Amino acid sequence: MTRPTTQIFDAAATARLMPYAALVDALRRASIDYAQQRIVSPERLVVPLNAGGIMLSMPATAPDLAIHKLVNVCASNGARHLPTIHGQVMAFDADTGETLFVLDGPTVTGRRTAAMSMLGIAAFAARTPREFLLIGTGTQALNHLEAIGELFPDALVWVKGSAPARAEAFCAEQSGKVRELRPLAEAGATIPASIEVVITLTTSKQPVYDEPARAERLVIGVGAFTPQMVEIGATTIGGSALFVDDEAGAKHEAGDFIQAGVDWARVGGIAAVLGKAQPVLGGPVVFKSVGCAAWDLAACRVARDALARG
C-alpha cells in the first residue's frame, strides 16, 4: 500500500496554520486536560551538543493526538550568522502512530508561548487591557506583539530594551502591528502608571522589573527558563499572588520564583483558575510561564484542525 507523503511546513506556513485566537482556545482546553492527566507530557530530556549547545526532546500524548518536539539550542550560532534555535514538531496519529505532519519548531514554540501569555491575561487581568509593556526586543517580543495586535488591536504597546536604541529600532521595524507602538527610549525611564500588563521577554540574570505589586497591573514572566535566570524581582513577587502554567516544570525552571525563595505551596496553576477550582481574589498577580510539550500538542491540534478544513 502506498503511503501518503508527510506534509512538512516551514516557518511561514506553520504560522498560517495557527492564528493566536485559536491557539488561546486550544491552550485553555489543554491546560485543563494536562492538569486532569488527559495529556501525558513528561519532563523534557536534555542532552549536550558541542560548544555548550543542547538538544531538547519533548513528547506529549493525548487520546486524539501525539506529538514530539525536537529542538537544538546553540547559543554560539550568532557568530555563525545562524538562528540560535532549530527544530521540528512532529504530529502523529494516536491510534496507529503514523506521522501526520511536521511543523517548524521555533515557530510553534514562539506562537504557543505568546498565546499562553494571552491566556494568562484572560485568566488574571482585572479588565480588558488597553496598555502593555514588553520588556525585551527579540523573537519572543515580536511573537507577543503579533498576538497583542491580533487579540487587542486597539492597544498601546510600550517596548523597553536592554538599551534605548534597541527599543527604538524594534518599534521602527514593527510599526503597524498594533495601533500604537512606543519605545521607552530613555535609560532608566519611569514605567507609565497607565500600563496594565507587563510581559518580560529576556534571558536576563538580574531583574528587569521589580516594581511594587499593583492590583491593576498583571505581570507575566516568559524569558527566564533556568534557575540562574531572573527577570522579575523579589519586590514584585513578594507582594503578588503567584501562578504558573506548568506546576511541575516551574519548580525546576522558573528562575524568578526560585531565586525569590517562594513557598511553592502558595503557587497556583492556571488550570485551577480556568476550571474555577481556585478563584483569583483581585489582588496583584504574577503569572510565570515555562512551557511544556502539552502546549505544543495544543498547537498541533490547531494545525490539524486547520488542515482538515483545507
Task: Name these PLM-found stretches.
Residues T137-G138:
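Glycine-rich Rossmann-fold phosphate-binding loop(s) that bind the pyrophosphate
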Residues K177-F257:
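Rossmann-like adenosine-cofactor binding region
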Residues L151-Q174:
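NAD(P)-binding Rossmann-fold cofactor-contacting core
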Residues A141-L142:
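N-terminal Rossmann-fold NAD(P) dinucleotide-binding loop
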